[in-house]
Amino acid sequence: MLQPKRTKFRKMQKGRNRGLSVNSEINFGKFGLKAIQRGRLTSRQIESARRAMSRSIKRQGKIWIRVFPDKPITKKPLEVRMGKGKGNVEYWVALIQPGKILYEIDEVSETIARYAFKLATAKLPITTTFVNKMVM
């Protein structure tokens, strides 16, 4: 699973997921998967979508993951009373804003890329769209 090697602080406040994305252009590949909806992706969801894509393109082409789960989510154990401090870190998430590029693919045809992204979208909890690199 994806998670930071080390962080300055173990736990983080909840915060809010507002605004639009900074990474809204394709930088590495020819095709991309862009988020339309706001949400958060766990490291398991990111890895599951990556596996689905890499299986569908059958070791041809290259995949880039453009999101990284750097926010820890804590959870208290079952049947524990409130209070006594914040719970332990349960999993890591990446906050997603509309317009963010999640994955990129290169060195495959457009039909294969569309099919791979369709499989990946089924694993993700947010709505996404297929985008091409703009060549000027």
UniProtKB/Swiss-Prot annotation:
Name of this protein: Large ribosomal subunit protein uL16
A single GO cellular-component term on record: cytosolic large ribosomal subunit
Molecular function GO labels: rRNA binding; structural constituent of ribosome; tRNA binding
Organism of provenance: Wigglesworthia glossinidia brevipalpis
Top-level taxon in the UniProt lineage: Bacteria
Family matches, as PROSITE patterns: RIBOSOMAL_L16_1, RIBOSOMAL_L16_2
Entry similarity comment: Belongs to the universal ribosomal protein uL16 family.
NCBIfam families registered for this protein in UniProt: rplP_bact
